[in-house]
């Protein structure tokens, strides 16, 4: 009984290693494409950063924040400036 359990565990271990190696080999081609994907995502986030920052968005000056928001110097985030006008 102990021998059959050990053989079963050994076979499962070999199958796991074999499946992991096959998956690694298959995903190797995906890793070559990932820098282009990361660059496109970076462009998306950079374009959003050029617009005004919404509530609790990071900022360095008041002009970074949207209307009715001001840059709070304590933690550098956009917060309501207390105004109600349009």
Swiss-Prot record:
Range of residues in the leader sequence: 1-21
Cysteine-cysteine disulfides: 52-66, 59-71, 65-78
Keyword annotations of the record: Disulfide bond, Ion channel impairing toxin, Knottin, Secreted, Signal, Toxin
UniProt GO cellular component terms: extracellular region
InterPro entries attached to this UniProt entry: Huwentoxin-1
Tissue: Expressed by the venom gland.
Source domain of life: Eukaryota
Compartments where found: Secreted
Record flagged with keyword Disulfide bond: yes
GO MF, any single term: toxin activity
Pfam families the UniProt entry points to: Toxin_12
Propiece residue ranges: 22-51
Record's keyword annotation contains Signal: yes
Free-text function comment from the UniProt entry: Probable ion channel inhibitor.
Family: Belongs to the neurotoxin 10 (Hwtx-1) family. 41 (Jztx-36) subfamily.
Domain characteristics, as noted in the entry: The presence of a 'disulfide through disulfide knot' structurally defines this protein as a knottin.
Entry protein name: U13-theraphotoxin-Cg1b
Organism of derivation: Chilobrachys guangxiensis
């Amino acid at each position: 009984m102990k021998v059959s359990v050990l053989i079963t565990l050994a076979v499962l271990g070999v199958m796991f290693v074999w499946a992991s190696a096959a998956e690694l080999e298959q995903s190797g081609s995906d890793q070559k494409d990932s820098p282009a994907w990361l660059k496109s995502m970076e462009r998306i986030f950079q374009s959003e950063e050029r617009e005004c920052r919404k509530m609790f968005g990071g900022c360095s000056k008041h002009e970074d924040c949207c209307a009715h928001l001001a840059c709070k110097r304590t933690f550098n985030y956009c917060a309501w400036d207390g105004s109600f006008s349009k």
